[in-house]
């Protein structure tokens, strides 16, 4: 009986967590849960004057293209320097 109850609790938690639960970095240290419709994490380079740039970390539905950009679809994957 305890096993059945535990199984039902686990299934309920898993089912409740299936919706929009992708987590991405929103800065170098902060994270966020992505809103509905945004199913990718991204880190992309935004240009400044004189050839310098900084990185923007966010959730997205369509990633930017670029040599330094990361586009991926697993939790907290947009901090690394490789795509996933």
Swiss-Prot record:
Gene3D superfamilies reported for this sequence: CD59
Highest taxon above the source species: Eukaryota
Molecular function terms from GO: acetylcholine receptor inhibitor activity; metal ion binding; toxin activity
Signal peptide segment: 1-21
Cysteine disulfide links: 24-41, 34-59, 63-71, 72-77
Record's GO cellular component terms: extracellular region
Site location (Contributes to dimerization): 58, 61, 64
Compartment(s): Secreted
Keywords in alphabetical order: Acetylcholine receptor inhibiting toxin, Disulfide bond, Metal-binding, Neurotoxin, Postsynaptic neurotoxin, Secreted, Signal, Toxin, Zinc
Residues reported to bind Zn(2+): 50
Predominant place of localization: secreted
Tissue-by-tissue expression: Expressed by the venom gland.
InterPro entries in the cross-refs: Snake_toxin-like_sf
Subunit note: Homodimer; non-covalently linked. Is able to form a tetramer of dimers in the presence of 2 zinc ions.
Note: Negative results: weakly inhibits human alpha-4-beta-4/CHRNA4-CHRNB4 and has no activity on human alpha-9-alpha-10/CHRNA9-CHRNA10 and human alpha-3-beta-4/CHRNA3-CHRNB4 nAChRs.
General function of this protein: Postsynaptic neurotoxin that produces potent, and completely reversible, postsynaptic neuromuscular blockade, as well as broad spectrum inhibition of human muscle and neuronal nicotinic acetylcholine receptors (nAChRs). Inhibition is potent or moderate, depending on the receptor (alpha-1-beta-1-delta-epsilon/CHRNA1-CHRNB1-CHRND-CHRNE (IC(50)=2.56 uM), alpha-4-beta-2/CHRNA4-CHRNB2 (IC(50)=1.8 uM), alpha-7/CHRNA7 (IC(50)=7 uM), and alpha-3-beta-2/CHRNA3-CHRNB2 (IC(50)=12.6 uM)). Acts as a competitive antagonist of ACh.
Protein family (similarity comment): Belongs to the three-finger toxin family. Short-chain subfamily.
Protein name: Three-finger toxin 3b
């Amino acid at each position: 009986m305890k096993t059945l109850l535990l199984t039902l609790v686990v299934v309920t938690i898993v089912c409740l967590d299936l919706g929009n639960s992708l987590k991405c970095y929103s800065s170098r240290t902060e994270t966020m849960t992505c809103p509905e419709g945004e199913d990718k994490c991204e880190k992309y380079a935004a240009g400044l004057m004189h050839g310098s740039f900084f990185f923007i970390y966010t959730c997205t539905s369509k990633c930017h293209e670029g040599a330094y950009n990361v586009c991926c679809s697993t939790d907290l994957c947009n901090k690394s320097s490789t795509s996933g």
